[in-house]
Amino acid sequence: MGKKKVHITSLGLLHFLVTSGRYAGRGGGGKGSDMRFTWLLFLALSNCFFCSIVSAKPAKAHCKNPYFWRCYGVPHTCPPGCPKFCQVDCKICKPYCACDKPGAVCQDPRFIGGDGIMFYFHGRKDKDFCLVTDAGIHINGHFIGKNNRKGRDFTWVQSIGVLFGRHRLFVGARKVSRWHAFDDNIHIQLDGADVEIPSGEGAVWESRGAGLTIERVAAENDVVVEVTGLVEIRARVVPITAEESRVHGYDIAEDDDCFAHLELSFKLSSPSPSLHGILGQTYAPDYRSRVKIGAAMPIMGGEKKFSSSHLFATDCAVSRFGTEGEEEGNELKTANVAKSQ
């Protein structure tokens, strides 16, 4: 909003000055009037130019791990592919776009598989789909969206439900009409109870009983969730901006619903060979991508087999959750058969 207001003010002033200049030229006024007009015109043009430059300036990021002392705290300019938000690889001390790394789920869901191949899975708005499923962990995503008169619905991941052990973790974006960057719009619950993370970048909330740690990567809307021995999830709440709506044709009204959603990045600690789900399957050792690699928008199908009845359901057709004992039993049977032979 700030940029738009400044441009309107600057251009309005410019229009006023040009109009005034025409009348001044007709009615005279002497050198003093001409000089004042020229000076004000210069200021108006400078103001427009300056605001355009400042608003386009990319964001900065830095390494936050003091172990990498050579890189720690060093500011880096975000790459052109993600000028508003990026992360720094502390090992090589270079910025990168988090949404371009394996394990990412961003935008109108755009996935980067464990094999490094990018694909889209659109699903359906107001429905839940299995993202990752394994014997010890199950992660569903709730999709929100908007009708598209030209074809499929536009969809985004509004929240995730993580099941591990006997626990249920909810991480979601609150519904907001007008986006304010300094409002914390991330909502987290563990087993139905709200999680109140202390304020401030670097603040940590921990549940030792659940083996769960949540850290604020930024003061608002950006956290890293770690389930010990299973998964690390980075979750960031972002809106659909007016520029994105214009470019992609989302047709989102400014004061209606900015469709706040999650940008996610998953790091799986010890995935089993039977790992499945929209994203999980791409980590399986025998997985072969079925998407059209050369397509402008490669689509992952299989909506029915990934569909779940609700956010914490494990009833999708490819569910693996809770099968740890079965897998161990099958391995034992195989071993006994081998010995008998």
Model-derived regions: residue spans:
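Low-complexity, Ser/Thr/Pro-rich intrinsically disordered segments found in N-terminal tails, propeptides
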Residues: 50-72, 113-115, 122-123, 130-133
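N-terminal leader/presequence-like segments
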Residues: 22-26, 31-35, 43, 52-54, ...
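A positional/structural detector of protein chain ends, strongest at the extreme C-terminus
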Residues: 1-4, 37-38, 339-341
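Intrinsically disordered, low-complexity N-terminal regions enriched in serine/proline/glycine
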Residues: 14, 22, 33, 49-50, ...
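Cleavable N-terminal signal peptides of Sec/SRP-targeted secreted and luminal proteins
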Residues: 8-19, 36-54
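Secreted, short cysteine-rich peptides and small extracellular cysteine-rich domains stabilized by multiple disulfide
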Residues: 57-100
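Intrinsically disordered, low-complexity basic segments at termini and long loops, enriched
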Residues: 1-33
